[in-house]
Amino acid sequence: FKRAKGRIQMGGRIVVFGSYVTDLTGRGTRFPVPGETVLGASFQMGPGGKGSNQAVAAFRAGGDVTLVTKLGRDAFGRAARDFYTAEGMNTGEWIEDETCETGAALIMVNQQSGQNMIMVLNGACSHITPEDVRAKQTLIEQADVLLVQMEINVGALEHVIRIAHESGVRVILNPAPVQKLADEMMAMVDTVTPNETEAAALTGVEVVDLNPPTARRRYF
């Protein structure tokens, strides 16, 4: 795992409650067809997951960032801690579960076309319990901004959003990968950051241009 050099400082306490997975990326000249084995050109292992990626990006931009995620007590979990320690980031709020494995993303990249195929195995991030969330309630309540995604189980996501909303914390939702949230929960979100596909899935309104349609503005 490698880290980038340099960061700036800025104010505001940011809590990212989301996923960490280890990215396992293989590159080759073509994808195998079902039942076929092909030789690849290169392999890379590194930190990933939408929650982790956004936490690292915000930290490198100068934010006061704490990531809350769940990992297994395994080699991938230890590698994650090593990476975050090298970044200078806080890992004290991470949840460990020896009964679960750390999540992983299996990524194949076609070097000729640039296309990829990805299978995400969320592992421990799919097993965040109500007790896990309650243990982080004070941390969430004291944040200025809560950033969440949809790579954790929906029950935990809704619990986290409700705590933040009731505490007056600004909630930003990156709705990826899209899962159904009750309208009541969407009303507790201050900012939603969908791409075109995610916006259409959430609203039922097809994206025909990149200017925000009136119907979508009304929804959000």
Range-by-range predicted roles:
Residues S42, V68-R73, T91-T102, N174-A176:
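Beta-strand->loop->alpha-helix junctions that form or flank phosphate-binding loops
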Residues V56, R81-D82, E158, R162, ...:
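Alpha-helical segments flanking ligand/cofactor-binding loops in enzyme cores
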Residues A4-L71, A75-M89:
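Glycine-rich phosphate/adenosyl-contacting loop at the front of the ribokinase-like
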Residues G88, S126-E131, V171-P177:
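Short gly/ser/thr-rich secondary-structure transition/capping motifs
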Residues I161-F220:
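Conserved phosphate/ATP/ADP-binding segment of small-molecule kinases
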Residues G92-D97, I107-V145:
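Conserved phosphate-binding/catalytic loop of the ribokinase/pfkB sugar-kinase fold
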Residues A75-E87, I107-V109, G114, I118, ...:
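Active-site-proximal loop->helix
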